[in-house]
Amino acid sequence: IPVRSPFGVTYGNKPVIDSTYSTLKEFPNRQLLGEDVIWNGNDEIGYHSSHRILSKGTHLGKGFYGEPTGKDIYYRVIADCACKNNQVYDEWIVRDQGAMVRQIGYSPEEFARKMIEKEGGVSNSSKLYDANSDKNSDYKAESYKDGSIAEKYTQVLSNIFNKSYEYEDYDRAANLFWPGNKLGHGREDIIEKWNSIKKIFTNIKFSIEHVGFLEEPEKNPRVSVRWFLEGEHANESDEYGKIGRAHV
């Protein structure tokens, strides 16, 4: 099983098991509160689930996040899993690390520096996920119909990054959950947050990698989209730091 995260790609179930034990050692009272699951598939072809989880716990043990602080934290995780024959065989996962370390007492920059130092410096540090990382998978996404909500929302995201967009597809009372446990209310906050990414990068390349969708009786249709963004870090911001000129 390949597991892809911002920290890179691991293979097999042992890294997953080790990571779970490590997390439980640091946060022994951790709870996983399911917020939503968007799934597709059947027993014959297998299933794909995109699940959004709110994790909460108390930092009580020494480990990846340093000495125990006794602080209560919460953060969100989104995982895309392909499953067949009661086994996960492909996974993508992203965790709100910025929210975690801020609540524990670090800034993201401070924590990143500690990680690099612990690994023996930049030249010895782990390779993070990038455009050249392994994306090969036996999983084949289910196609969506023309004119469907899945097509509509992928087009919204493409418009945000590829053209001048007026955000007319967002309701004026829409909410936005953003990394760092940040919450936006209304169209103005949504525009501000998306623009905060667009402003710091040049030579942006945006692509859609996977679309999950779910339409159920008497419920609003839901869509999960995994997308990939590349660009040059060319402008400074309070949220994303000083100009690095790095390809991100």
Residue locations for each model-derived region?
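C-terminal and inter-domain tail/linker signature
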Residues: 1-247
